[in-house]
Structures are given as C-alpha cells and as structure tokens.
C-alpha cells in the first residue's frame, strides 16, 4: 500500500482512541447517508514530491496534506444536546480534541519514519437544511501536513 494510505490509517487509528466523542472515524471523504453522527473523515488531498539529486539511488522527499473533517449536527436539530451549547462551542471542542490527540509524537509512535506533522489550517462551515433534504450540520476541516521520504520506485516504503 502507498505510504499515504499507511499515514491515513495511522491518523484514523489515533483519532479513534479513547477518550473519543466519535461514533466513527472514516478513511474517506464520502460518508454514507446512514452514517451515525457525529463522525470524522480522514483523507489525503494532495502530495508534493521533490527528488533529492544528492542520492544516486533516488530519494523523494514528500509532503502530503491530510484532511481531518469533523461532522456535527447543529445543536437543536435532533442531536440530543438540548441547545446547551452553541455550534461554535462544539466546533471548537472538536478542534481541540483533534489537536490534542494528533501530534508529531503520536504519529511517530504509529509510523516511526515520518519526519514531521503540523497543523496547517482549520476551516469551519455550517450547512442548514439545504434543498436536497440533508441534515443541518457543521463541518470542521483541519489540514495537516506530513513530511516523509521514500526511495524512487518504492512509494510503499518509508525511509
């Protein structure tokens, strides 16, 4: 399997550990219509590569962007919250939990040869019952940058 998949699986494993508030952590950007809320999605969006010319065997430095997307029902729309907190509070709590769990050290504990992991950005949006009948929800997207290296022709092996 490609190293991106290894990293994506490691991130999902870390986020699924207790304590957790998530019904599930999906390794895809497409949730099923029967998904139990709240949930997280983990997927790679891009990967930049640079060949290091100082190595005769061909080494690629890679930088992948992994998105962690938290999906939450808007309070008061059947989420059982009783409107005790605002959607902003819930989005901030989600962000804090992900940032607390997902660190360079926790990733290296699962995938030892990664070079670094850093939070690049966080975006938040709210979708209120749009025309297609979807659930009113909030989405928090965190972009994480992971750097690592592979040998030329061996994208399945970290070095």
Regions found by a protein language model. Give the residues of each.
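Short, well-ordered secondary-structure micro-motifs within conserved domains or adaptor modules
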Residues: 35-44
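Charged, amphipathic alpha-helical segments and their flanking helix caps
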Residues: 1-34, 47-159
